[in-house]
Amino acid sequence: MVQHITLHDMTLRDGMHPKRHQISLEQMKDIARGLDAAGVPLIEVTHGDGLGGASVNYGFPAHSDEEYLRAVLGELKQARVSALLLPGIGTVDHLRMAHEIGVHTIRVATHCTEADVSEQHIGMARKLGMDTVGFLMMAHMAPVQTLVQQALLMESYGANCLYITDSAGHMLPHDVTEKLGAVRQALRPETELGFHGHHNLAMGVANSLAAIACGASRIDAAAAGLGAGAGNTPMEVLVAVCERMGIETGVDVYRIADVAEDLVVPIMDHPIRIDRDALTLGYAGVYSSFLLFAKRAEAKYRIPAREILVELGRQRLVGGQEDMIEDTAITLARERGLLVP
């Protein structure tokens, strides 16, 4: 088992989803200062869907990516900043902007079977000298050998770290062990391995520990779990558990707990918890950021969000297909006579 890990904070990026991308600059700066003082080494900052995510499909943020990034970068004493980029949403120009203003790490994210679309962005990030991460989303949807092949593609493009991402919070510890173990064995020894979890089945901490046992040295978490669905792995809990297990994180357990309680919980629009809809995300294997879209469709078409999410899982929809959520709700409403054709 790895004895020292890098914790990567998601509060100011994945946490944008439950906030409908409306975190203010002052809130960003306050939380970033708290994370920095607690010893968190890497903080991700962008629209919830990454650089360039501002759109009708994904939602318009209170401020631009550049404004958020500049605000946070100006507050940090030791932590570095990362940005997420999904090819097809974010562009090479977004990547250059992030590099020019001081972003250290770029994470290029694709669906777990579509690593080939990341070549241009990973190659450019490496050319710019950035810490470059390949980020394979919805990893529960691909068999082990497919994940291995996709990870090796990203590594061949220049990624120096590969993430296996449980975007739906669907994986259990044995799934993590099987998939990350195989990927770790296939990658070059110098290529780092990371894990990003969601807490929809309350497996965030357990899955992170399983990942660490497989050799993952980078683990994503969020203060108070602020993130899509039932949230990300709660950082304050993970730090406490790691400390008890002798795994070094460099993060102060009391300070990160204070950030969660005093800075993050007060800005929540609703409690980040495993309600019936978030549970359905994990159980049915649905992309966590679909949750609020399904709740909005429920209010509009009188179809329970849970039933919409189950149907999305049956259709195996993936990130980027947010426009299909309303279509699915309309179809279900028509089938039940709730809409007149």
From Swiss-Prot:
PROSITE patterns: PYR_CT. Keywords: Aromatic hydrocarbons catabolism, Lyase, Manganese, Metal-binding. SUPFAM superfamilies: Aldolase, post-HMGL domain-like. It is an enzyme of class 4 (lyase). Mn(2+) binds at residues 14, 196, 198. CDD domains: DRE_TIM_HOA. GO terms for molecular function: 2-isopropylmalate synthase activity; 4-hydroxy-2-oxovalerate aldolase activity; manganese ion binding. It comes from the Bacteria. Substrate binds at residues 13-14, 167, 196, 287. Residues 5-257 form the Pyruvate carboxyltransferase domain. It catalyses: (S)-4-hydroxy-2-oxopentanoate = acetaldehyde + pyruvate. Its EC number is 4.1.3.39. The record marks 13 as: Transition state stabilizer. It holds the Pfam family HMGL-like. HAMAP family: HOA (MF_01656). PANTHER family: 2-ISOPROPYLMALATE SYNTHASE 1, CHLOROPLASTIC-RELATED (PTHR10277:SF9), HOMOCITRATE SYNTHASE-RELATED (PTHR10277). This is 4-hydroxy-2-oxovalerate aldolase 3. It comes from Cupriavidus necator (strain ATCC 17699 / DSM 428 / KCTC 22496 / NCIMB 10442 / H16 / Stanier 337).
